[in-house]
Amino acid sequence: MASAASASASAVVTPSSFRCVPTASCGLGARGKAPAPRRLLHDHAQGKKRAAATWSLKAGLWDSLRSGFLKSNNSTETVEPPSAPIEEEEPLPEELVLLERTLADGSTEQIIFSSAGDVNVYDLQALCDKVGWPRRPLTKIAASLRNSYLVATLHSVTTPSKAEGEERKQLIGMARATSDHAFNATIWDVLVDPSYQGQGLGKALMEKVIRTLLQRDISNITLFADNKVVDFYKNLGFEADPQGIKGMFWYPRF
């Protein structure tokens, strides 16, 4: 499920929500509720409290680009910025158990989604090697993570059946997004360990990323998709070249 600069798509989506099992460090505990069943935790409820919404890309994108001006009676009025800078609240990280299962040796494996952005660059490089991505300088990988608006991860955490065994934690998936923190976000570097593909984890990761961006009031969501994964993103609600809008690229020619 790697994302590459091949074909562009823009999202007008409202992702399905998840029923989640909060971890101890999450701080989003479901008080008094029994643990969720050991399966991929999709919520198939009808969502009565939240009406489905779609965003018009033409209105949303272009309105955001011209949002510094108001037109009234054929005159243009400049919108004055606030007198004091508005401090942006730091979004609280989210950590959820998406899947829990017992392995053949009796150990327990949990697949944990996190938006805390805690990624070891060496673990990420190893994951990129597994999916066949070309290696990039570690300093640039670290900079890309540091400068991202959102970094979401999937970790496999295995707890042995015997108390004396050590817990094992492995990075198995990641996606990140850059943003102007107001209107637009672009999703990059979506990847899942090949040994964990085909289990719905890539879809779960993307839906959580989209939902997190929507919760932060980011409604114009774009990405670049390799031809092999265009259908995957279309099934999530992304649209290629909406209303004739084309992605354009500039490359150095030296």
Curated annotation (Swiss-Prot):
Residues 1-83 form a transit peptide. This is Serotonin N-acetyltransferase 1, chloroplastic. GO terms for cellular component: chloroplast; nucleus. It is an enzyme of class 2 (transferase). Keywords: Acyltransferase, Chloroplast, Melatonin biosynthesis, Nucleus, Plastid, Transferase, Transit peptide. Catalyzes the N-acetylation of serotonin into N-acetylserotonin, the penultimate step in the synthesis of melatonin. Catalyzes in vitro the N-acetylation of tryptamine to produce N-acetyltryptamine, 5-methoxytryptamine to produce melatonin and tyramine to produce N-acetyltyramine. Acetyltransferase required for geminivirus infection and systemic spread. It comes from Oryza sativa subsp. indica (Rice). Its main location: plastid. GO terms for biological process: circadian rhythm; defense response to fungus; melatonin biosynthetic process; mucilage biosynthetic process involved in seed coat development; negative regulation of seed germination; photosynthetic state transition; protein quality control for misfolded or incompletely synthesized proteins; regulation of anthocyanin metabolic process. CDD domains: NAT_SF (cd04301). Pathway: Aromatic compound metabolism; melatonin biosynthesis; melatonin from serotonin: step 1/2. The gene is SNAT1. It catalyses: a 2-arylethylamine + acetyl-CoA = an N-acetyl-2-arylethylamine + CoA + H(+). Residues 119-254 form the N-acetyltransferase domain. It holds the Pfam family Acetyltransf_1.
